[in-house]
């Protein structure tokens, strides 16, 4: 009997295994850059490379490359220094936030050492240099030297000298601390180095002699570890089955740092880097690009914009550059002065089905909304959008709703605003201060950062005071009324809390289950249920693989459910359980993975390709119901347990589906091997 079961399983496994494998629900993935080599360390046959604040290793024997990230080996990201200890055979990985990992270079096992990261220290915690001596690492920081036992993985001593130590060394049984500010200090290794009085000044500052690693650099420069060119992802858009990204971070004179203008496009696991050596062509620095917009009809025809005007690319090459001198675009006005082409502010673009490109020209004397059709630019100047002698200074988030109206926001503290533009009538309506909620209470908004339409046609607004939403009926109102979702406390009182009240929302996306993903400036990312009443997930850099709590952009691959998350430390993704729906469920578009389910698999089994709110039943070959529920968008997940909480036995299980109105769909099969 057992033999017959395995023969049947083997036959059916051949049928179901034709479907490709997919990432499991809940999986995290990192897309890290490794282009800028910063430090190199040799460890036997391995060469460890710190590049773009990330880490990879090259094997001299077989020429293989191993990349490392927070997803699979490391405990953090954004590396400041690496250093190898030959005695302990461990690599010290120091992060910019002062966290420390110790990696065994024989098997990649990693020990986290968070003591220094968690320590409360008055002054600069930056590690300026690392010196290896025996099994110890000496870390030079703003107040002295930290002695770290690399073999035991613990901090042995801290020598508080009271001044910044730039580097140190040990020779002739003496330890030397070199400080640009205080000169050179020395103490005998046999002395009590914890006693500040044992250290004496012996001279002025001497710069260190750097080890010649030119040959290693030559070798490393030829390696191709993959990944994007930069870790900057201020703006992202998923379209044409590709992720289009740019670095951005500039809005109306507000920029935390200057970022390269490079456009990076992800297709599957392959990156295409658009031409970025264009300064000699345009005459201006190519940087601070905060919007990329592919032609809706042509994935290889792409527009980009930001601080210095509008750029047009075909097949990754620059074909046109539009500025104030060769087009109707206008430069920004600053304190009554019209600036040059270094400040032609175009923060948002939108390509529509009719072949038009819509352009927002911020802080300009006359311009605000511009239409491009057949390479011709047409101005739709709006006096409503002008204040202080120029247009709104940070117009961004351009989108089209299901009625064909254009919406965008002004992300500036002087005039935070929500704008609706109707192309057919060339009319604009702007909603600005004072804002009130549905109860008439005034909302003190400082920034309105983003706007998205959900599947029920509500328009969600991300602000520094949390998320709000409006309906298109607001166009008939004379007041700027925003709805704040109230979440009942369910504690026996009638009290409720505003949904993410006071949380600074920087970006958002709506998935195919009508759930909202909210990115924040310093609190990670939230997933809120379709009815807005439940917090499904709150991912932070502490409780998950999220790279950083500072979220700059979110984009979703609706076909797979992969949620791309751009942070200030790079790009990662989370495989969610909501995908695009199918109007009809057939054997060609409904399938399950992993399939077969092998004995060592303990994750969720995913059924995808379903219709919206599809009814799903999973039954055994004997007809016994083992699981049932409704889909999230086009996806349903099953943990492999029956209705009584028991793991199901080996066998073939039928997935029966029906639409939300009861019309039966298709049947797919799942093979489970225990």
What are these regions (language model features)?
Residues 21-590, 625:
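Carboxylate-rich, polar loop motifs that coordinate divalent cations or form catalytic acidic clusters
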Residues 325, 384, 632-633, 671:
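A generic structural motif
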Residues 297, 352, 401, 600, ...:
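Surface-exposed coil/turn segments at beta-strand junctions on protein surfaces, enriched
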Residues 13, 584-617, 635-638:
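Glycine-centered coil/turn sites that cap beta-strands in beta-rich domains
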Residues 70, 631-663:
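Short, surface-exposed loop/turn motifs with a glycine/proline- and acidic-biased composition
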Residues 665-670:
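Edge beta-strands of extracellular beta-sandwich domains
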Residues 1-27, 356-358, 674:
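Bacterial Sec-dependent N-terminal signal peptides
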Residues 615-626, 645, 653:
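Short, glycine-anchored, charge-dense loop/turn motifs used at functional sites
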